[in-house]
Amino acid sequence: MPQESSDAKRIEPPRKVDFMLKPRFTNTVPDVPFDAKFMTCPFVPLGRFVEFQPAAIYRDYKHAVICDDDMGLNVDLIDLKKYDEDPIETEIDEKDNILLEDDGAAKLIAKRSQQHSKLVPWMRKTEYISTEFNRFGVTADRQETKLGYNLKKNQQVEDMYRDKQSQIDAINKTFEDVRKPVKEHYSKKGVKAVEESFVFPDFDHWKHLFAHVQFDGDTITTEFEEEDERQQARESSVIKAMEFEDQKFAAVFVPTIGCLTSFMDDLELERPFDEDMKYEFLLSREYTFKMEHLPPRDRDVFIMYHRNNVFQYNEVDCNVKMTRKPKMALSRKSKLTLTYRNPSELEQKDMNKREAELYEQPKTRKQEILEKIQEKKEEGGDSSDQSSDSDDDKPQKSRSDSSSDVSSDDDSPRKKEPTVDSDSD
């Protein structure tokens, strides 16, 4: 009898060669014309779960809009004509009307077995003693003995805004509710509205920059006879950046009695200042400061004031925190003399630009980045042109430097700084 050897090779079936080709996808869908947005859920308010306040990292994050690559469809995302009503009413077939009917929640239950599952507070369903059936316990929905459970369950509106007409009625109701005056606070009992007023931007002073300055104490050390003079001196004080023996700090100067008198005369004459008058201020305190500039998109602090029966607000350009120095560098008798002037052409141009930005639509992050890149490219091109013609500009530059020394300080463009003379005794 022949014996089969263990070393015999195993016969394998031949491997089939399939046609393999990597699939190629094309995406012909146009770009989305606007960024992705979060939509509020009208059914469940998110405030009942957590009080969420979006931070800057959430506002700056761009959510990716993921579309199928093989969708070769021309999608028109914005078509305002779809919301227009068709003046010509088209008749719909009776069979199609049956398909368009809403599923009514109040239909009568035809089956008798479904009527036996009603929950009443004076009956309790039979519970079978079993490890498998009763393992997870009785949930809150199965507690039929709770008083008023069936009444509370009937009040829950599960199919809210299911049809088109209910949504239209709910939207129209919001316009009617807005017309009703609201006098009482929504959460605090006893708090009622006393006066209603409009809130507008300060169109007159929007061109000026405002700063939010925080002090750690009273800034006035001079003694005044009346409290009104002290308050007027506090409002008219001047903060000036100083540098003394490699020390940088901010000094607060308080107007003198004669300076306050000049301010009152200007108010009576209805003029901003007197060009020939020199206003004197005395040193009050010295502070170390920390300044934080706020970009236009992240400005969430505004100043608000009541003027002409209208509330007005303005933006805060920067936050400044002042900390009092334990040891003063200048003398207590240091004096600051100011002479006011009208803004220069460059300053007036900046004011007009800021005033025009009030009526413009705010720019997105992408637009700001593209504008900065474009400005850097233009500056790079200007610097290359100047370096190529540096030999021709040298004598002209020396003449301009010599002429600038002779010219007065008022001709040079600077940003809203009065002429300052600091004299220390």
Curated annotation (Swiss-Prot):
User: Is Nucleus tagged as a keyword?
Assistant: yes
Q: Name one GO molecular function term.
A: chromatin binding
Chief place where the protein resides: nucleus
**Phenotype of the disruptant?**
RNAi-mediated knock-down is mostly embryonic lethal. Embryogenesis proceeds more slowly, with embryos displaying defects in the positioning and shape of epidermal cells. Leo-1 partly mislocalizes to the cytoplasm, but nuclear localization of rtfo-1 is unaffected.
Answer yes or no on keyword Transcription: yes
Q: Which family does it belong to?
A: Belongs to the PAF1 family.
The identity of this protein, by name, is: RNA polymerase II-associated factor 1 homolog
Q: What is the lineage of its organism?
A: Eukaryota, Metazoa, Ecdysozoa, Nematoda, Chromadorea
